[in-house]
Amino acid sequence: MDTETVLYIVVAILATGLIGVGGFLWRKENNSKGGSFLNNLEWRRAVKHFGKDVVDTKPIEKAIINAPSAFGLQPFKVVVVTDLETKKKLRSVSFEQAQIEECQTLYIFCAIKDIDVRVEQFIDETKNEALRPMIKGFLDNCPDKIAWAKYQTYIALGFGLAAAAEKQIYSCPMEGFLADKYVEILGLNSNMIPCVLLAVGSESKDQKLHPRFRFGEDDLLIRL
């Protein structure tokens, strides 16, 4: 083996090693800056103000659509509001919370009152008649179908929040609004009940975030 060939092999080995080290350092740096799911959750804050820059909300919407729900029924609708004038009207019936108007996109999670209609729609779409007696049996024994549907909206909200954190998009889950006024302003039909909101958008340069606090696992988790 001549000298030139040996040098070529040595250079190739060194290059491969550098690429591997570089990849490791890149992963380490990105994980330390929010590259992992858990780090991104720790990064997340419920912001009170939003900036003017445009963010890509498609990942959030995809997460909401793909969030789990009981039987896969998704007994809710999500109203997506980007129109400024509409957001101003909604702010006036949301105790003047600034996020409503300042956010780029406001997601309004609405429970569906008539669950039976949703079940029929689900069976028609999935062609899975075997699920009908199971779902019907559950709903017939459900003490409060509307409350149950409302619970499902919070699951979808959680996945939307997680997706926003994953993309480091600023967000704020919200209650504190007059649901009947939302129905009126948005022209919703009587089968929809606004339950909870998710405001998303870009960072406000004037944002002042308070230190984050979470109870520790010894307090929050009860292990048996």
Q: Residue ranges of each PLM-predicted region?
A:
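Acidic, surface-exposed loops and disordered segments
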Residues: 2-224
